[in-house]
C-alpha cells in the first residue's frame, strides 16, 4: 500500500499589504465600485479630447487635397513650367506638401507609359508631347467642328443652287413651258405689293443688260442695252387698270440704235437696241 506524503508547505512570499488589498478588491466583483471614479472620469475626458482633435485634423485636410488626381494635376502644372521639363522630386514633394512616396506613385505611372524618363534618382524629364499648346487643343477642336458645319452648309447651298438652276432651265427652255412664258395685266394687278407703285414691264431678248445709276432726288434712271434684238418697254397703270406703251405721265423713254430688220435670222451682225427710262417723282 502506498503511503500518502504530507502536503509540503510552500514558503510564504513577502507582499506589500497595500498591494494585497488592491489585488483582493480587483478580484472581488462586489468591490469594483470601490475603484476611484475620478480616475475613470479623467480617462474618458482624455479620450474625448483625443477624438475631437482627430476630427479637427480631418476637416483641415480634405481627402481630395491628397488624392492622386489632385496631385497629378499639380504635378503637370509644375512640369509645364519647368525649364526643359526637368523636375527635382525633392522640391516637388516640398511644393505639394506630401511625402516623396506619393510623388513616386505619379512618376512611376508616367514612366510606364513613356511620358517621363528618370535622369537620376530624384530627377525626371518630361518626354511626352509639347505641353505649351495643351490649352489650345479644345479651341482647335471647336474650330474644326465649326469648319465641318460650314462645309456641310456649303454643300447644302450647292444642292439648292443646282436645283434652282434645273427648275429655271425647265421653265425657260422646256418646249411645253415656252408657250406659257408670259404674264397678263391681270396677273400684275393681282399682286398687292405693286399697288400704288409705278410698274414698268420690259420685254427684251436674252443677255440684255440693265444698269440702274444712283438715283437723284427727283428721278430714277434705268439703262437697258441689248445686242440681240429690240427692247419693248411697257408702263402698267395698276391703279387705273390701263396699260400704255412707251409713254405715260411722269415716265419718259428714248430709243437709239434700234432697227427692225425684215429677216433678223439671216443678218450676220446682231441687232443692237438701247432704251433709256427716266421716272420722275
Swiss-Prot record:
Region Dimerization, residue ranges: 130-222
Protein name according to UniProt: Transcription factor E2F6
Annotated segments matching region Disordered: 241-281
Record location of the Glycyl lysine isopeptide (Lys-Gly) (interchain with G-Cter in SUMO2) cross-link: 9
Chain segments carrying region Transcription repression: 173-281
Annotated region (Leucine-zipper), positions in chain: 143-164
Primary subcellular site in the record, as a coarse category: nucleus
Biological process annotations from GO: negative regulation of transcription by RNA polymerase II; regulation of transcription by RNA polymerase II
Gene Ontology MF terms in the entry: DNA-binding transcription factor activity, RNA polymerase II-specific; DNA-binding transcription repressor activity, RNA polymerase II-specific; protein dimerization activity; RNA polymerase II cis-regulatory region sequence-specific DNA binding
Annotation: DNA-binding region: 50-129
GO terms for cellular component: chromatin; MLL1 complex; nucleoplasm; nucleus; RNA polymerase II transcription regulator complex
Subcellular location: Nucleus
Keyword Ubl conjugation: yes
Similarity remark: Belongs to the E2F/DP family.
PANTHER family, per the entry: TRANSCRIPTION FACTOR E2F, TRANSCRIPTION FACTOR E2F6
InterPro entries linked to this entry: E2F, E2F-DP_heterodim, E2F_CC-MB, E2F_WHTH_DNA-bd_dom, WH-like_DNA-bd_sf, WH_DNA-bd_sf
Known partners and oligomeric status: Forms heterodimers with DP family members TFDP1 or TFDP2. Component of the DRTF1/E2F transcription factor complex. Part of the E2F6.com-1 complex in G0 phase composed of E2F6, MGA, MAX, TFDP1, CBX3, BAT8, EUHMTASE1, RING1, RNF2, MBLR, L3MBTL2 and YAF2. Component of some MLL1/MLL complex, at least composed of the core components KMT2A/MLL1, ASH2L, HCFC1/HCF1, WDR5 and RBBP5, as well as the facultative components BACC1, CHD8, E2F6, HSP70, INO80C, KANSL1, LAS1L, MAX, MCRS1, MGA, KAT8/MOF, PELP1, PHF20, PRP31, RING2, RUVB1/TIP49A, RUVB2/TIP49B, SENP3, TAF1, TAF4, TAF6, TAF7, TAF9 and TEX10.
Entry keyword Chloroplast: no
SMART domains recorded: E2F_TDP
